[in-house]
Amino acid sequence: MLDSAKRLRRAWKRAHLRVREIRMIVKGLVSTDHPIDAHIIPMRRCNLACAYCNEYDDFSKPVPLDKMYQRLDHLAALGTAIVTISGGEPLLHPELDSIIARVRRHGMIAGMITNGYLLTADRIKRLNRAWLDHLQISIDNVMPDEVSKKSLKVLDKKLQLLGEHANFHVNINSVVGGGIHNPKDALAIGKRALELGFTSTVGIIHDGGGQLQPLRDEEREVYAAMRSMEKSSYARINYFQDNIAHGRENHWRCRAG
């Protein structure tokens, strides 16, 4: 059980983050002269090898901290609102906490996407001290299989640790498409996320060739059910996925003109 001091601390951080998110959304609507969300990869190496993923290797070294600082400073100079740290697996970078702290020092929202395998109580507390804003874990199935080891069975203890120790917002993203064998697993994952006090989203995953395909009937039903569970925030501005799910064309417009 969370003590009252921790609940108050989380509530304060949640309210403060919400104000910053609203400010970012308003700024993005008023002006198109700056990036909204920049993804940055400090570590391409990953500790897993999911069959559908082509965004990792097993040999790359961490990007040096001075180069990461240069890139983050430049993003700040451009007026970037959000920096999402991904990979590979960002928790493998030995200076990750300093990278997160640099993002926050510039007033940008600091998010991270991780597979969650390397989370411990101490690691979560270090992320708190670095002032991480958002953490997302993508869980692909209930039981691990040859496509993905990012399963609820393996990661549920990590989720419980996050529920106990994290002061930052946690979102659990489940997926359909891309060779995932049991689409209904996404519903079980989403319900578990809500039980633990997290938010839940669903994504359409690409196949091994990097291509997004329209969803099958069962996948569309699960996708619709999951979308109804999502809460409104800037991270849910993803209506383009509805078109992908139904095989409809998206009409993109570049914010830069």
Predicted regions and their residues:
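Cysteine-cluster motifs in flexible loop/terminal segments that predominantly coordinate metals
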Residues: A49, A256-G257
